[in-house]
Amino acid sequence: MKKRDIPPVVMMLSPMSAAMRQFVALIAAPIIITACKSATNPPDSPPGDTTVSITGRRMFPADNPWNKDISSEPVDPASDVLINTCGASAPLHPDFGTTWEGGPIGIPFVVVRGDQPRVPVTFDYDDESDPGPYPIPPGAPIEGGASSNGDRHVLVVDADNWKLYELFDAHPVSSGASWTAGSGAIFDLSSNSLRPAGWTSADAAGLPILPGLVRYDEVVEQKVIAHALRFTCPTTRRAYVAPARHFASSRTDAAQPPMGMRVRLKASVDLSSYPANVQVILRALKTYGMFLADNGSSFFLSGTHDMRWNDEELGAMKRLHGRDFEVVRMGTIVTQ
């Protein structure tokens, strides 16, 4: 779901289709180890399918849109219409966790050191992709697993140079000696720079993916999420609003939400009955909200795969619905 237009249909994605895995320890070489090793690793998971903490390091500067407190920002005049289009009665769905139907759920990422060897990457959309080589380690986890026919994202963080490398529809060639991908983007995590106007990334909206994921290390270890999150809607407009840089639709109806639309959980929602870990996520949704980043199922919230997640606990979020959210007032909507 990238550069090409999305036809006017409601796309119902299974929980497996939107996201996959996590972070790997900062050590001299990138290795993929599992946080909860067991004899029952999911199919297609890389050797040692990992989870780790990123030790609280914040992505992007404090004044970056991802890190902005929007709890007091005005509500957009079109909020009700836009929420209805996305699905006012749809439950908030955690599109991450442990496994579903035998496969891992959540978007994976891996951490490497600055001396990680770079490998060449060939892109389908090379005119809107940042050229390689990329520091992709052997055995880097792919969203959905090696045989996935989904979005197949690969996310790599160079922790020494504080850069993020992301691929969409990524396929290793010759055991990872090189890769092919639909598109790719490199983000300087110490900068506020955006993609060029009109450019995609590894995400439909031209946004980075990793900064918008719910991560186990934040929720359970740090007990705070200090940034916006990422979600999807079934249909979108041929338009985007900053910090998004790209649209992925042919629809021009103003009732359709533009990419980059930011929503927040209403301040009136009582969080006291939710599990403590879920409250961490919901407080972030009140304070920082979440960006519309791709076409997908209604109010699917993205996060990392981690075998330590409690899926039943995360499921408590489904008690919330689209109508519990409101659109934060948008700036200039770009349609060309």
Residue locations for each model-derived region?
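Short, surface-exposed polybasic-aromatic patches that bind anionic ligands, especially phosphate groups
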Residues: S45-Q336
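Bacterial N-terminal signal peptides that target proteins for export
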Residues: K2-V24
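Sec-dependent N-terminal signal peptides
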Residues: A25-P30
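Short, conserved catalytic or interaction motifs in soluble domains
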Residues: S38
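C-terminal motif of bacterial Sec signal peptides marking the signal peptidase cleavage site
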Residues: T34-A35
